[in-house]
Every structure is written in C-alpha cells, then in structure tokens.
Amino acid sequence: MTSFQSTLDDDEDGIAEELAASQREISVAEFFEKNKHMLGFDSGARGLVTAVKEAVDNALDATEEAGILPDIYVEISEGRDYYTLIVEDNGPGITNAQIPKIFGKLLYGSRFHAREQSRGQQGIGISAAVLYSQLTSGKPVRIESRTQDSETANVYELIIDTDTNEPEISAETEVSAAKSDLRGTHGTRIEMALDANMRARGQLHDYIKHTAVVNPHARIELQEPGGELKSERAEEASLPAETDEILPHPHGVELGTLIKMLAETDSHSVSGFLQSEFTRVGSKTATGIIDAFRDEHFGREMRWRPPADADLEATVADAVANKDATHTAVFARTVADAVRDADSIAPAELGALVADAAADAQDDTGTSFGETVQANVVAAVRDALTSDRVADVLGPVDEATTVQKDDATVRGLAERIAAKFESGGDTDRVTRDTLDEYVFRAAENTAEYADATIGETARENVADALWARMATVPDDPPNTSALADDRDAASDLLAAMASVNVMAPPTSCLSPIEADQLEAGLRTEFDADFYAAATRDADVHGGDPFIVEAGIAYGGDIDSEGGVQLMRFANRVPLVYQRGACATTDVLGDIGWRNYNLSQPGGSGLPQGPAVIMVHVASTNVPFTSESKDAIANVPEIEAEIELAVREAARELKSFLQKRQSMRKRQQKQDVIMDILPTMAEKVGELTGRGGVDVSDSLARIMNNVLVERARSDDGQTVTLRVENHGTGSVDVDVTDIVSAEPDGVGDDASVVAMDDEYFVKWTPAVAGDDAAELTYSVDADADCELSVSGVADARLTVSEADT
C-alpha cells in the first residue's frame, strides 16, 4: 500500500491543491438526505408515523395560531408501489408565496428565534417529510391551500433540490372552490407518496390517541387501510391560552450567544444592554450584575482598619503643604473622623472619602484642597492604615478556621497572606482567583514551616472570609462594543450574570394543558373508574421556563395485563419512540409504586395494572436527546418536577384505591350479615308470633349505613321518604322517586319534573351524622313508584321500599 506521507513528500503542493479542489459546501438538505434516520425516517414503518406526526403538528399549530378549533383529517391508502398520505386541516391557509418555502426548504420557519412554547421550532419537520417522500417514491408532493375569504385555492407540486435546499416546483395552478379537494372553505391539504408499511400501526394509533388526550380541543379523524379512528373534541373544550414571546433569561445564555448579543445591541452601556435584552432584569438587578462583573473583571480591594494608636489628623496635616494651618486642621479632622467612622476602608473608598472631605473643608474655610493634595493625603493615610496588615488579616482568618488550629498556625497563615497583599501593589486589589492563590500559597508555606495541616475546607473558608471583607471597586465597566471585542471580559460578564439571583422567567410564554383539560382528555379517550391530573408551578432549567403536568386513569376498560400504559408528551406532542431513553421513563421507574397500591415486581421499573400514566413537559426549549425529538434528556430540574407531578396524581390514586378496598371489605361484611340477619329475623318472628320482620333498619344500624326507605300509608295515597344517617359524617343524598301519576303536596325542599307520562320527585337532603330527614307527598292509590338513590357509595347505602 502506498504511503500517504510519501505521496505528499513527492508533490506536496499538487496534493494540497487536489485535496482543496475536492472540498465543497453541502446544503442542510443534502446532509439530511444522507442522514434521514436522525429525523425519525429510518424505516418504512416509522417513516409513515413520523410523516403523519409532522403534518398533524403543523396543522395543530396553524389552527391554534389563527384561533380556530382544529379539525384534522388524515388518510392513508395503499397503492401498488407506494402508500399515499393525505393530511388536511381547517386552518387559515397559507399565502401563495409562502407555500413553496414552507414545504420545500429545510430550516425555514417562524419560531426558531422565538422564546415561547411551540410544537415545532427548527423549521425541519414537514419539509423533512417532503424530502423522505421524494427520496423513497421519486414523486413530488401536492400541496393545496386556501386562505380565509379567498374564492380560489393555490395548488403546488414540488420537491426539494437537495443541492441548494430550495423548492423545485413542477406544477403551480389556481383552482376554484368547486374544483378544490379541500373539504372546507379554508385550510391546507398535503398529499405525498412514500415507501412505507403499516407494521407500526400500533404506534400510529397511539400517536393519534395520545394527541387527542393533550389536545382535547381538537377533532382528529384517521382513515387507514381496513379501518378508521376518530377522536372527538371534548365537550366545552377551548383553545390553549395564547403565549407571549419573552426575552432570554440571564441564566440561560452561553458565551458565544452573549458576545453576539453585545455586538448587535443598540445599547451603549452594560446596564442598558442588560435591561433591554434580557427578561426579569430591572435597574436593581442590572446594578447587581454590574457589581458582580466588577468583582470578576477588576477584582476587589482589601479594607484596612486604622491602628488604635494612629494619629490620623497629624498624618493628613503632614501630607498637606502650603495651606493655612487652621484650614488644614479642619480638613485633617474631617478626614480622620470619616476614616474612623468607616471602621475599615479600601483604597478606592479612601479616595472618595478624601474628596468629600476636601469639598466640605473648602465650604467651611474657603481653601481649596486640590487633586494633588488629595493624592498625597490618600497615600499617607493608606500607609497608616496598612502599617499593621497582619492584625487586619488575622481576624477573618481566626474566625474562618476551627478551634483545632493553634494560635501559632493561625498567626503564621495570617502573616503570610498579609505579606502577599503587601507585595501586590498600592491598591490592594485582587481577583477572587488571585486571592485563592494567596491563601493556597500561604497555607502551603505554613504547613511546611509550622508542621501544621491546613485542609481544603479551611482554605476555602479563609478565602471566603477575606473576600467578604473586601470592597467592590467603583470602576466603570467597558461599553458593550468593547465587551463584544474582548472575549475574556465577556466571559466575566457571563459569570456575573450567572452569580446573581434573578427572578425566574415569566410563564406567559408557556401554554400548559391545565389539570381540568388534561382530565377531560383522559376521560374522552379512556373509559376508566378513576381520573386524576396535576399541573406543577413553573420552574427553570438553563434559563428556560418549563411546566410539568401528569395525569393518571385507572380501572374500567383499561387493560389490566402487564405494565401500565405510559404516555409521554413534550409541548403537546406525543413521544411514541425511544421510551427507554427518556427521562420520563427513568423517573417513573425510580418511584416506589407499591406505596401507591400498584404492583411493581422487583420494586423498580414501571408499575403493573390497569392504569394509564401520562406526563407532559411544556417549555420554550425542551431538551431532547436527538434531532428526532423522541425522548427528553435527563435534566435534573425537569426530572425533579416530573417526579413531583406524578406523585401528586398518584396520591389521589392511592386514596381512591384505599377507599375502594375499604368499601369492598365493607360490602363483604354486609353480605355476610345479610346472609344471617333474615334467618334470625324469621326465627324471632316465629317466637314472638309477629311474623316477618324487615331487617333493613337493623342492617343500616349495624353497618353505620345511610338508610333510605319509602313507605306508603294503608290506603296507598300517602308516600313517605325517609333518610337516616347512621354514620358520623354528613351526607348529601340524591333521592328520586319515579311516580306514574302526578304527585301532590310535595314540600318546598323537593321538586317535580314531568317526563314521558312519568313524574320525577327529586329530593336532595343534607343529613348530619346520627340524624334523619323526611319528605311526604300524596299520590293516587293505584300509582306505581320506583325509588332511585345516588350520592352514597353502594357499600354504605341501604334502601328499603315498602308498599304499605
């Protein structure tokens, strides 16, 4: 084999030119043409599901943005060589000029730069489906769209030119409403041929069904070979709340993005930039960030205390030349008093203090103490302040170290740190990194010469104590253009933004489903015995707000074999693939479901039983594991909220199951008593000669039940309804007596409704524990009566009907 290096040695320039000639730019369409699996088009079965998903997501977004309740029609038909997919919506339609770009150009969309919740963002989805269609069938897709109030529809047939990532239009026509294939007066219809199969029918049905759960305001119809699937709109369902676009959050930007923003902003000052380009940043927060930037970029200055025996007035007077002695004394006294009042003071603070004292002295004496005098005074006072650095450093060092450190070790450490400051310059200004280095070197030297150990924790505590003692400098930060050209300075600004507490982003950019709508969606798609839903408060990850919602349906017609059904969603879009790679699955598997009365073999993993568990993550930036957006990444903040939301719904399930178990045991006990009590009553009747005895009253008392009984007078014309509560808590009982003749004399606390020659006497008494309520009315003796009772669990209810 010929050595590549030897070839280069023979003709380096020629090879370089040859290699350079082979290099060329590739378009994004060409890239995804060769890597379509990255977008979820890795097989015919999955490709069909992904194409349906992208088209339906587009339809939902279009209708919702126009304020239209979505009606979406999906049709899949099998041809001789290919499958045909048709997706139609009742949205506002697309303008003629935009149709080719939306469907024939990858990375073309309106949401990429918008920080608000949306199903799609990159502008890849539907155009990727078009690309997959042309790659597998070689046919153009057909798009027909009609805008509101338009008399005609625009029809395009196109493919994507993968070399240029531009639409290649093969046909363009305008048709009248009568000749349009659209079923409504406005909307969009896309028809594509693709190499596919129905082996993923289950995932396709899951997608449609799950989409209906989190979009209860939508009506979706699927027509497929051999059947149909319809998801009707939930009653009283409304459109999701409109979202607002927000600015980026200071905690959510990266360095490159920050530099770009600095270069493009119209603001000159850093304060203006922060307040105009970021959310939740007002004047106070901007000041805090700028101070943190000063700490990062310029460092802090050490504060020193004047020695107790220092004669500051004399020090100031000696530094002033050629001024009236009396006036100088006034100036010196003003400076000395201010320094002592400050307790400890940094060089920059000292300069400001001396300037203020000079102004006050001039007002009092008329003598000017100019910049030269002030500089001399600052230098002289600073020398006095720093004459005993060790004493100033010793205090914080002693407080930060444990009592296990002997005095000699602590003093030795303080002396070495003070020496570092002494050699550091006139301003005693250091960054936090430099301060950490001071402490580290001093600790190493102390350990070496004093045979003492100063651990990492002690060093950090000492550095923290000294840093807290130091003063933020007043230096003005660079302007935005200077920061944009200085990567290190921009990095310092980014660190400052991250270090300051900033209020969480507003949640107006999010549109959660909300617990009541989520429960309505579950009720629409699942016939269960129990439903619960929970919507958490907003939280933040990486500067992006997010909300987690969870819902549970249990029992009823839900399959009880095997594991529970898990439904995962992100921004109202079902995630039907890569369940095992999703953070949602990981979190649910770590929950101890036995605590919630669900079976969980091995104590980990998804529980088993007749249940559906759904989790929805809504965010301006959902962190997916891949470009196909099939699974949510393991972000700790999101995982924590998923667990809390699911546990909130699961607690309601636990309460329901415990109550049902209690009712089941109660019913079993009642059944046993009912097997015994009639026999006992019969024997008692024989012994007493009183004949048969109604055991309903006795059963109600024994079981602490609610007894509802109806009795008629001997002539049959008076009906008495009586409710006795033998329990401890109050109950609201819905009693309905269905009568074949019109009743009379019904009290004000009841009502009569006539329907189809029958009369419904409706009575809803609230009966306290160990109390009773009674209702009496008149009726023809020949009238038939049928008693119906609700509002009380069957296991706690005893009903007795007597003709006389």
Curated annotation (Swiss-Prot):
It catalyses: ATP-dependent breakage, passage and rejoining of double-stranded DNA. ATP binds at residues 58, 89, 110-111, 120-127, 629. Keywords: ATP-binding, DNA-binding, Isomerase, Nucleotide-binding, Topoisomerase. GO terms for biological process: DNA topological change. It comes from the Archaea. InterPro entries: HATPase_C_sf, Ribosomal_Su5_D2-typ_SF, Ribsml_uS5_D2-typ_fold_subgr, Top6b_C, TopoVI_B, TopoVI_B_transducer. One of its GO terms (cellular component) is cytosol. Transmembrane segments: none annotated. GO terms for molecular function: ATP binding; DNA binding; DNA topoisomerase type II (double strand cut, ATP-hydrolyzing) activity. Its EC number is 5.6.2.2. It is an enzyme of class 5 (isomerase). The keyword Electron transport does not apply. Relaxes both positive and negative superturns and exhibits a strong decatenase activity. NCBIfam families: PRK04184.1, PRK14868.1, top6b. Homodimer. Heterotetramer of two Top6A and two Top6B chains. Belongs to the TOP6B family. This is Type 2 DNA topoisomerase 6 subunit B.
